[in-house]
From Swiss-Prot:
GO terms for cellular component: cytosol. Disulfide bonds: none annotated. It is found in: Cytoplasm. Belongs to the TACO1 family. The keyword Transcription applies. Keywords: Cytoplasm, DNA-binding, Transcription, Transcription regulation. One of its GO terms (biological process) is regulation of DNA-templated transcription. This is Probable transcriptional regulatory protein BT0025. GO terms for molecular function: DNA binding.
Amino acid sequence: MSGHSKWSTIKRKKGALDAKRNKIFTKLIREISIAAKMGGGDIESNSRLRLAVNKARVSNMPKDNIEKAIKKGSGDDNIGSEYFELTYEAYAPHGVALIIKCLTDNKNRTASEVRSVLSKSGGSLGAPGSVSYMFHKKGLISYSLDKYPEDEIIELALEAGAEDIYSEGSQIEVITSAENFEAISSFLRTKFEEDIAEIALIPGNKLSLNKEQMDKVLALIEKLEDFDDVQEVVHNLEIIDEIN
């Protein structure tokens, strides 16, 4: 019986992981299709599509799925014309700032759901500009130090004009201005294959909480991310794996 119980637990966990992965894939496919619809299916000339495809690859989306999403967006159907991009500024419990990016075909549904999730978890919507000033739009390029020597990445990144470089564990992050992101990422790509390359909102300062407070905020963020219309939740929470 114990073996059966263990196997059932494994299956449930696998099912939950598969469901989460499918939800991520659905959001990525939508973003790829919209990007292709708006700027064409050529990755080289469509920077938004290039970033969306890169995210999909990092998430291990099958190549066929990516290609189908590009074809769907760059075809003659009406995808994209009925979708809207929405950005909400909000507060989680304990003053954590949130920027919630959505892609939806129904503004009222999205607004209602986002507001409901926030209010049920102790958060609240903010006015436009209430938290966005806490974040800076930057280029973010991440590499695995298991693949490349740290000193080589640093040397080339500084030569390319990177603003900042951070390394932690087996990852190194190169920060650029939003304006120079494309040029710098292309320059570095001649020698290194990045794990992540995107325009990101980076908090000027991060907010530290105790474990109980942090878990409450992370639970809210997860609930928001579980909503299909939410593409991304940016926050200024300092996430610490273990708090004594």
